[in-house]
């Protein structure tokens, strides 16, 4: 492996080893190995233009919900990753709120360095409520 890069098993290529990329790759390994998400359902740096052609920006990680027949805008999981010290939880939440104008995921994961927060969509209130961890993908 060349110095200064990490191998991304989803994009199947080496990527620059930035602090944020370290968080992203650790999150991908967590999703694959602990949550048991099939690799083919994971999208890295998912372009929001796939949902709305007038929208730019990218979601760090999206886990599609195709098994349940869900549309592209209703993923199983939306993940935002940031290197420690780059963002506050409030700034990360504000960025996430912009994505939630287009996407309605079942779960949300915020990874700020080693600190992680999880949320689940409440089907009645349509609000995200904190949860202890993600369920295993089924």
Task: Give the role of each language-model region.
Residues 1-107, 113-138:
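A short, conserved, highly charged catalytic patch centered on acidic carboxylates
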């Amino acid at each position: 492996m060349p110095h200064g890069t990490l191998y991304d098993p989803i994009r199947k290529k080496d990527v620059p080893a930035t602090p944020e990329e370290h968080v992203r790759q650790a999150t991908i390994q967590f999703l694959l190995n602990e949550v048991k998400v099939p690799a083919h359902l994971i999208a890295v740096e998912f372009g929001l233009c796939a949902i709305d052609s007038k929208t730019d920006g990218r979601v760090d990680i999206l886990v599609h919900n195709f098994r349940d027949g869900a549309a592209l805008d209703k993923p199983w999981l939306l993940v935002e990753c940031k290197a420690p010290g780059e963002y506050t939880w409030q700034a990360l939440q504000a960025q996430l709120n912009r994505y939630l104008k287009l996407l309605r995921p079942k779960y949300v994961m915020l990874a700020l360095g080693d600190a992680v927060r999880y949320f689940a969509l409440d089907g009645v209130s349509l609000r995200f409520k904190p949860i202890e961890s993600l369920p295993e993908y089924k």
